Swiss-Prot record:
Changing T226A: Abolishes autophosphorylation. This is Serine/threonine-protein kinase ATG1. Belongs to the protein kinase superfamily. Ser/Thr protein kinase family. APG1/unc-51/ULK1 subfamily. Homodimer. Dimerization requires the presence of ATG13. Forms a ternary complex with ATG13 and ATG17. Also interacts with ATG11. Activated by hypophosphorylated form of ATG13 (present in nitrogen starvation conditions). Also activated by autophopsphorylation of Thr-226 and inhibited by phosphorylation of Ser-34. It comes from Saccharomyces cerevisiae (strain ATCC 204508 / S288c) (Baker's yeast).
Length: 897
């Protein structure tokens, strides 16, 4: 066994690797992604034989789905050999890593030609000559010469034809996955070029499809429903979560060809739902920029590829037989310039320099950190790392003076903004949808793994008391617990901060949930806990619950029990006096419950407040208001709304809500385990507030949902780290329930945030149409009030605690006062969190600040300065004061009992 040697002292590769053709030497790191590092390398025995070495750490593939994606890629690449597909030379596995020895493409990927052309013409000797021989149609946009377009179209078609013969669909065709190898290496003329199986123009860089992490075997008649691909190049049927077949690749080909011609994708939007709406609204009418001179035959082909309905879209056989795809390109081949091109190609090979090394600065885009081999490094799903490099949503969040200045400066460069938007959108897709897949996959794995008969106990600073979680378990659940060997009476431990009160002194949340509203129907707690508990956790009648039990898999009969969620949530919130910051605890079986419960409590109070805002935007139906005992009451917020709607309002629905309702009523699944049942009972109307107030409400709700997503994402990452480091793949029922609760809230927050984004964009469009025509876009935007997450939580926490104190003085509803004080404390603790950029367990959660970029140190400092030290001192004083009130209240309650 020989070592992979490394000439670059900045990195270290010391793992043993035996290859059939000899040992390999890793030279310079050329790409680094979420799960892999890509090195430029060569055969140790022959330095002229260059390879790309993709090192994938097993430790990073904690999710079974990620490991499966890598295994799929390896299996596919082993089976396919084609001149226009990046080849797998060798593959080795060790106990800690995978090594994929792959064909080396020194010219990066297609995005270099599209986005970095001017820099390449100045610095890259070969590409400078190529662009001189095949000049772009315009200096003002990123379109390529017709020779490039047709050559790469034919090479794409050749590779796809081969994939179809193997019943393979790639599912992620995009410029970043189309790598370019140096021409005139291994052949010297057109004849030898075509004899090797290549198509197209022999003296242009050769296009090769890479990254088969999303690919799968899919016969022409089969349908898939996994959300894969990058949104700007994704077929509409995938964007709309519909089943799709191999024709999805043809749509992606159409978008790539359009971008090669025009320099920009055919459709752009800030999220995949907006993108789908734009595509559908276009009604198969593809608009080509006026600066693009494209012949009718090529336009017709692009339009046939970009057909909305897959059934009407051009088929593979028709595509392969198309006149443009089969056009003779020999007239573009430059025999006279062959010696010069051949000499410069050999110079590139001999210099052994990657394309990015020729540029003045390492390109942060179009390929982010990977410089041409991003697709290889990010491959088995481009999942977790995107959380630290991109944003969930684009609506306003916590703003600073710095970020506002950045926004204003960026608005002066529309072209730059469009490129940044494209790249940001591609990353956003990874954040939202792939993280959702990861969260649900992990929750399913934990749920199905079984329970540990020795449950993990909850550590507290005082005595532990095991109390009955639910005295009214159904026979089904009773039997299930017995089969699993765990007593349902050991599922939760309530604790008191001041002595030995009986654990049964407090009524269950099911008994109390309607009385919660007596705290004050207009404040946040009544809405947050009343609405969230009754509408979102419960509300199903006995018959519906029985139907769910009979139709659900065994593990879900208990784990998704709404009564269990009621008790779990309440007791976590009430355990505020045992708050331990997760960062101070070691991640092991002893502390996992404390860590997850602290994070779950923070997520719940933020989520609950987001629900208040959501219910103001989309009011509850009359039935639900009756269930929650909120009829005929009005909010006292500055954004006060009437909860009752005139019957006429129910007849008016806007397009966004119609779409949302259709999804809800069909309980469409957004990734495994993600359903819309929680929101399927919404009423059919929006409130009739002024648009400016509705926009503010949407902004506030989105910011709160995003913060909840950030905490929930961190919780699932902590769970993932613990789960995959654990020797035993089993856990207590308590941990299992916590994981399922985190999954449910993550999916719901994600769904509602997406919905609100669509709503706020519609509101902004309508609002903009009402302002004076001479008002500039910047003036319009500046009218929106900035939203600060910390201020939202701080103000609401004080409001809740003041109302609780007022009721305590009257001696009313002491149980609810206790819950109110605890909720207030959790909110204040959450407002002090600075963990949006770091994570004690080595991974990054979602960012909640839209305008910050993870690599910008100055922005991070500005973010943390939203609360200065004086602000923090004030908040800590309030925490101490409210905690003292809570302690006194509990002593009073214990004395009464």
């Amino acid at each position: 066994m020989g070592d992979i040697k490394n000439k670059d002292h900045t990195t270290s590769v010391n793992h043993n690797l035996m290859a059939s053709a000899g040992n390999y030497t890793a030279e310079k790191e050329i790409g680094k992604g979420s799960f892999a590092t890509v090195y430029r390398g060569h055969l140790t025995s022959d330095k002229s034989q260059h390879v790309a070495i993709k090192e994938v750490s097993r430790a990073k593939l904690k999710n079974k789905k990620l490991l499966e994606n890598l295994e799929i890629e390896i299996a596919i690449l082993k089976k396919i050999k084609h001149p226009h597909i990046v080849g797998l030379i060798d593959c080795e596995r060790t106990s800690t890593d995978f090594y994929l020895i792959m064909e080396y493409c020194a010219l990066g990927d297609l995005t270099f030609l599209l986005k970095r052309r001017k820099e390449l013409m100045e610095n890259h000797p070969l590409l400078r000559t190529v662009f001189e021989k095949y000049p772009p149609p315009s200096e003002n946009h990123n379109g390529l010469h017709r020779a490039f377009v047709l050559s790469y179209l034919q090479q794409l078609a050749s590779a796809l034809k081969f994939l179809r013969s193997k019943n393979l669909v790639h599912r992620d065709i995009k410029p970043q996955n189309l790598l370019l190898s140096t021409p005139l290496i291994g052949y010297h003329d057109s004849k030898s070029f075509h004899e090797l199986g290549f198509v197209g123009i022999y003296n242009l860089p050769i296009l090769k499809i890479a990254d088969f992490g999303f690919a799968r075997f899919l016969p022409n008649t089969s349908l898939a429903e996994t959300l894969c691909g990058s949104p700007l190049y994704m077929a509409p049927e995938i964007l709309n979560y519909q089943k799709y077949n191999a024709k999805a690749d043809l749509w992606s080909v159409g978008t790539v060809v359009f971008e090669m011609c025009c320099g920009t994708p055919p459709f752009r939007a800030s999220n995949h739902l907006e993108l789908f709406k734009k595509i559908k609204r276009a009604n198969d009418v593809i608009t080509f920029p006026s600066y693009c001179n494209i012949e009718p035959e090529l336009k017709e082909l692009i339009c046939s590829l970009l057909t909305f309905d897959p059934a009407q879209r051009i088929g593979f056989e028709e595509f392969f037989a198309n006149k443009v795809v089969n056009e003779d390109l020999s007239s573009y081949e430059l025999e006279d310039d062959l010696p010069e091109l051949e000499s410069k190609s050999k110079g590139i090979v001999e210099s052994n320099m990657f394309v990015s090394e020729y540029l003045s600065k390492q390109p942060k885009s179009p390929n982010s950190n990977l410089a041409g081999h991003q697709s290889m490094a990010d491959n088995p799903a481009e999942l977790s790392d995107a959380l630290k490099n991109s944003n969930i949503l684009t609506a306003p969040a916590v703003k600073t003076d710095h970020t506002q200045a950045v926004d204003k400066k960026a608005s002066n460069n529309k072209y730059h903004n469009s490129l940044v938007s494209d790249r940001s959108f591609e990353r956003e897709y990874v954040v939202v949808e792939k993280k959702s897949v990861e969260v649900n996959s992990l929750a399913d794995e934990v749920a199905q793994a079984g329970f540990n008969p020795n449950p993990i106990k909850h550590p507290t600073s005082t005595q532990n008391q095991n109390v009955l979680l639910n005295e009214q378990f159904s026979p089904n659940n009773q039997q299930y617990f017995q089969n699993q060997g765990e007593n349902p009476r050991l599922l939760r431990a309530t604790s008191s901060s001041s002595g030995g009160s009986d654990g049964s002194r407090r009524p269950s949340l099911v008994d109390r949930r309607l009385s919660i509203s007596s705290l004050n129907p207009s404040n946040a707690l009544s809405r947050a806990l009343g609405i969230a508990s009754t509408r979102l956790f419960g509300g199903a009648n006995q018959q519906q619950q029985q139907q769910q039990i009979t139709s659900s898999p065994p593990y879900s009969q208990t784990l998704l029990n709404s009564q269990l969620f009621h008790e779990l949530t309440e007791n976590i919130i009430l355990r505020i006096d045992h708050l331990q910051h997760p960062e101070t605890l070691k991640l092991d079986n002893t502390n996992i419950v404390s860590i997850l419960e602290s994070l779950a409590a923070k997520a719940f109070v933020v989520y609950s407040y987001a629900e208040v805002k959501f219910s103001q935007i989309v009011p509850l139906s009359t039935t639900l208001k009756g269930m929650a005992n909120f009829e005929n009451r009005r909010s006292m917020d500055s954004n006060a709304i009437a909860e009752e709607q005139d019957s006429d309002d129910a007849e008016e629905e806007d397009e966004t809500l119609k779409k949302y309702k259709e999804d809800c009523l069909s309980t469409k699944t957004f990734g495994k385990g993600r359903t819309l049942s929680a929101t399927s009972q919404l009423s059919a109307t929006f409130n009739k507030l002024p648009r400016s107030e509705m926009i503010l409400l949407c902004n506030e709700a989105i910011v709160l949902y995003m913060k909840a997503l950030s905490i929930l994402s961190k919780s699932m990452q902590v769970t993932s780290n613990w789960w995959y480091e654990s020797q035993e793949k089993s856990c207590s029922l308590r941990v299992n329930v916590l994981v399922q609760w985190l999954r449910e809230k993550f999916n719901e927050c994600l769904e509602k945030a997406d919905f609100l984004r669509l709503k706020i964009n519609d509101l902004r469009f309508k609002h903009a149409s009402e302002v004076a025509e001479n008002q500039t876009l910047e003036e319009k935007g500046s009218s929106e009030e900035p939203v600060y997450l910390e201020k939202l939580l701080y103000d609401r926490a004080l409001e809740i605690s003041k109302m609780a104190a007022h009721m305590e003085l009257k001696g009313e509803n002491l149980y609810n006062c206790e819950l109110a004080y605890a909720t207030s404390l959790w909110m204040l603790e959450t407002s002090l969190d600075d963990d949006d950029f770091t994570n004690a367990y080595g991974d990054y959660p979602f960012k909640t600040n839209i305008h910050l970029k993870s690599n910008d140190v100055e922005d991070k400092e500005k973010y943390h300065s939203v609360l200065d030290e004086n602000d923090r001192i004030i908040i800590r004083k309030y925490i101490d004061s409210i905690a003292n009130r809570l302690k006194i209240l509990r002593q009073k309650m214990n004395h009464q009992n």
